[in-house]
A protein has these predicted regions:
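A conserved beta-strand/loop capping segment in the N-terminal third of enzymes
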Residues: 50-119
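Short beta-strand to alpha-helix junction loop
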Residues: 80-88, 107-127, 137, 174-176, ...
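A conserved FAD-binding loop/helix module that cradles the flavin
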Residues: 170, 174-188, 387-413
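Short hydrophobic core segments
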Residues: 12-14, 39, 142, 165-178, ...
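Glycine-rich FAD pyrophosphate-binding loop
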Residues: 12, 28-54
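Beta1/beta-strand and adjacent pyrophosphate-binding region of the FAD-binding site
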Residues: 4-19
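A conserved short coil-to-beta-strand element within the FAD-binding core of flavoproteins
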Residues: 138-152
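Residue-level recognition of phosphate/Mg2+-coordinating polar/acidic sites
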Residues: 29, 44, 65-68, 85, ...
Length: 413
């Protein structure tokens, strides 16, 4: 077992995820003479790929303009702008198609393999790595890294019960949010933005949404502090989820972490409707003679609000008919619809895409090659960097892009 680990390697890649594999394949294809090794601490490579997108793998997003693409990244967008001019979603699509995997675009522009199976993506990455001569070792954890006086790095790797030595000319760190590796990177002189969760759901306990799990509203506007996000929202057993919530959690990741995941939340159930416009519509419903004797609770004034939700938002009115609603009640209802006040009591996990914000300070990385500006021959790719996107394939895209650039840098540098 220890024979391979004491061998001198040209390239060692810590992390067997999407960025690590993409870098390894790119590097080995550009320079087949290089000895490339991937170290993966778990018992399976590409685990995140396999569980993402509900097992379908949201490979990327059909956004092919780098200037627009960077707007989907709460952190790291500006650093990625130049990187996306060299490898962007269109290049990702072409890469997978060239290697035998076709992608499809869904209505919301998320892109998946036509097989609807994440295993398709994991299998092609494993196959291409093996085909390019990349060696992969699982259950191998990077324990220590030292810069060698003669160039390159001396590593200590734990595999099984042993800690074994390894030497490499270049090292790529692609270990995501792994805390042990963060400490190693710090020991080499890099600064780290401490990671906190991003892309999570909100725990909310409120009688207005009790028993409504599964009810979706097509377009709401959410406000928290100075942040605003709009889009679909889903009521769950534990609170609120859906694209609008996930985007707000991403942009507000640090704010919510500082608040211990407790905050006030304003919900406009009508999207961009203002109070005055809402009052006018409610008044028309009151004045319309056919409505006068209909109960407010069963006759929604807005088609975009599901009837079950409408009933609970109007509970304070009781069983009144539209013709009997008072001006005060009408104003209170308008305020409830356009600026409902809720309390976030904690965070839930978005199982399809676990993401953190934070990581290696981007000013310390050359985004043309992904090489460290602090330590020669040290490279970074993927979520170990202080980059995170909203849900929709953007986090995988930053992994493909930084992995591809790192692979090019490792092969040519």
């Amino acid at each position: 077992m220890s024979n391979y680990i004491t061998t001198k390697w040209d390239i060692v890649i810590a992390g067997g995820g999407p960025a690590g594999f993409f870098a390894a394949i790119r590097c080995a294809e550009l320079n087949p003479d290089l000895r490339v090794l991937i170290l993966e601490k778990s018992t399976q490579t590409l685990g995140k790929v396999l569980i993402s997108g509900g097992g379908r793998c949201n490979v990327t997003h059909a956004c092919f303009d780098p200037a627009q693409l960077i707007t989907y990244y709460p952190r790291g967008g500006m650093a990625l702008r130049g990187a996306f001019t060299r490898f962007q979603p269109l290049d990702t699509v072409k890469w997978f198609e060239t290697h035998g995997v076709k992608l499809k675009t869904e209505a919301d522009n998320r892109m998946f393999p036509i097989t609807d199976s994440a295993k398709t993506i994991a299998d092609i990455l494993n196959f291409e790595a093996k085909n390019a001569g990349v060696k992969v070792h699982i259950g191998a954890t990077l324990q220590k890294v030292e810069k060698s006086p003669r160039g390159g790095f001396r590593l200590e790797v734990r595999k099984g019960g042993e800690v074994l030595p390894l030497q490499t000319k270049k090292l790529l760190v692609a270990t995501g949010s792994d805390p042990k590796t963060r400490e190693i990177v710090k020991s080499l002189g890099h600064s780290i933005e401490e990671p906190v969760p991003s892309l999570f759901t909100f725990n909310v306990k409120d009688k207005r949404i009790d028993g409504l799990a599964g009810v979706a509203v097509e377009n709401v506007t959410l406000k928290m502090d100075a942040l605003t996000q709009s889009g679909p929202m889903l009521i769950t057993h534990w609170g609120l989820s859906g694209p609008a919530v996930l985007r707000l959690s991403a942009w507000g990741a640090r704010i919510l972490a500082d608040k211990k995941y407790r905050s006030s939340l304003t919900v406009n159930w009508l999207g961009d409707y203002k109070l005055d416009a809402t009052l006018e519509i409610l008044q028309r419903n009151k004045d319309w003679h056919e409505n006068a004797r209909k109960k407010i609770s069963v006759q929604p004034a807005f088609s975009q609000i599901p009837i079950r939700l409408w009933k609970q938002l109007t509970q304070f009115i009781g069983e009144k008919n539209w013709g009997d609603i008072s001006k005060a009640e009408m104003r209170k209802l308008a305020e409830e619809l356009t600026a409902g006040q809720f309390e976030i009591l904690g965070k839930g996990q978005f199982k399809e895409e676990f993401v953190t914000c934070g990581g290696v300070n981007l000013d310390e990385v050359d985004f043309k090659t992904m090489q460290s500006r602090v330590v020669e021959d040290l490279y970074f790719a993927g979520e170990v960097l202080d980059i995170d996107g909203i849900t929709g394939g953007f986090n995988f895209q930053s992994s493909w892009t930084t992995g591809w650039l790192a692979g090019s840098g490792l092969a040519n540098g």
